[in-house]
Design a protein with these regions (language model features):
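PAPS-dependent sulfotransferase catalytic core
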Residues: 1-81, 216-224
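A periodicity- and composition-biased signal for non-globular, repetitive helical segments
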Residues: 20, 106, 130-131, 231-234
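C-terminal accessory extensions appended to soluble enzyme cores
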Residues: 211-234
Length: 234
């Protein structure tokens, strides 16, 4: 068993959780064999632990629709053992370790039961920006279906994504109300050259700031800065 509690990174999809995870990984948190898709999640945990659970309870493995019902979440046996075994096999020795998955909040009770001392990072983004991103992203297609729109009581794809964002936000409130050790971070602030939240988050996690972080994230923020016509001064 791993004595060190994990860092669990979540947020509504299209919110920038992958960028935050990349920073935390660069600053020393072990993540195992990171996602081939550049999303800074762990593929083995996703595909062999989380996805089967979602399939078993009959919800969407992409975390779009249908979603788990919080009050009806079942706690599977051996969750902690399965997750830690992946990390150990993939080379974990000691120190901070992390797992990033936007769907963590949809099943927070499972993870909280397995890792009650985990530190949670909730990555946020403005609702309108999330919805715009969903509408532009090919695999975000749950609410192109009129059947799904009708099921959640809306009549357009945009309204469907608004409903969906609210579902995630309700889970965030539940997590905080439950007393879980959560820190909220808004990556958009970095677009304007404000890195204070990421500094504070790393300090809270007990990880050192590395100057290479700026070289990692600035190119990721470039397109957003161009659209917003933001000039930063380092």
């Amino acid at each position: 068993m791993i004595e060190q509690a994990p860092i669990l990174i979540t947020g509504i999809p299209r919110s920038g959780a992958s960028m935050i995870a990349s920073v935390i990984n660069m600053c020393g948190a072990f993540g195992g064999n990171m996602s081939k898709r550049g999303m800074f999640g762990n593929d083995k945990i996703r595909e062999e632990v989380v996805d089967p659970y979602f399939n078993n309870i009959g919800v969407d493995t992409l975390g779009q629709y249908p979603l788990p019902v919080t009050d009806d979440i079942s706690i599977p046996a051996g969750w902690r053992r399965k997750v830690e075994q992946v990390m150990l096999v993939e080379g974990y020795k000691e120190g901070q370790w992390m797992y990033k998955d936007a769907r963590l909040s949809l099943m927070w009770a499972v993870w909280h039961y397995a890792f009650p001392d985990a530190k949670w990072i909730i990555v946020r983004r403005r609702t309108g920006d999330i919805i715009s991103s969903c509408l532009r992203t090919g695999f975000m297609e749950a609410f192109t279906s009129q059947e799904n729109q009708k099921a959640v009581g809306v009549s357009t794809e945009e309204e469907g994504w608004l409903w969906w964002v609210r579902q995630y936000e309700e889970r965030f409130v539940e997590m905080i109300t439950e007393g879980m050790n959560c820190k909220v971070i808004w990556p958009e602030r970095m677009v304007y050259g404000d890195y204070q939240q990421i500094y504070e988050t790393l300090e809270w996690l007990g990880l050192p700031w590395k100057s290479e972080v700026l070289s990692l994230i600035d190119p990721l923020l470039w397109n957003v800065r161009q659209k917003k016509k933001v000039i930063t001064h380092k």
